[in-house]
Amino acid sequence: MEKTITIYTDGACSGNPGKGGWGALLMYGNTRKEISGYDPATTNNRMEMMAAIRALEALKEPCRVELYSDSAYLVNAMNQGWLKRWLKNGWKTASKKPVENIDLWQEIVKLTTLHRVTFHKVKGHSDNQYNNRCDELARLAIKEQS
């Protein structure tokens, strides 16, 4: 039987572009795993995406995933058909410009083929303890490298 994993993710940037960090919380039953990382020169959107990528990569087998993010960029691309249109249009936006962060979108395509992922938008910097913890992990990753 396929496991259902709950994942919360967040990215942060000190300057945009600037130093960035990402954090993720993976939960299955009573088990929790926290992961985070750092990039010395990045953007907030890239860190939001990297959090989702690294969390999905951490799964040891194909799973059903409920992924929660405060990134409208990430969630809308997945839920409003942006990603499908970009693929259909050869990685071009509706205005015929190249899609930004194509390298990370290609990773997300691979990972969402392996796992059955449902993306959920949560309000950032609010009362969601899991999203707040991911924000803390992302900011700590920046602080520890600075």
UniProtKB/Swiss-Prot annotation:
One of its GO terms (biological process) is DNA replication, removal of RNA primer. Residues 1-143 form the RNase H type-1 domain. It is an enzyme of class 3 (hydrolase). One of its GO terms (molecular function) is nucleic acid binding. InterPro entries: RNase_H, RNaseH-like_sf, RNaseH_domain, RNaseH_sf, RNaseHI. It catalyses: Endonucleolytic cleavage to 5'-phosphomonoester. Its cofactor is Mg(2+). Keywords: Cytoplasm, Endonuclease, Hydrolase, Magnesium, Metal-binding, Nuclease. Endonuclease that specifically degrades the RNA of RNA-DNA hybrids. This is Ribonuclease H. The lineage of its organism: Bacteria, Pseudomonadati, Chlorobiota, Chlorobiia, Chlorobiales.
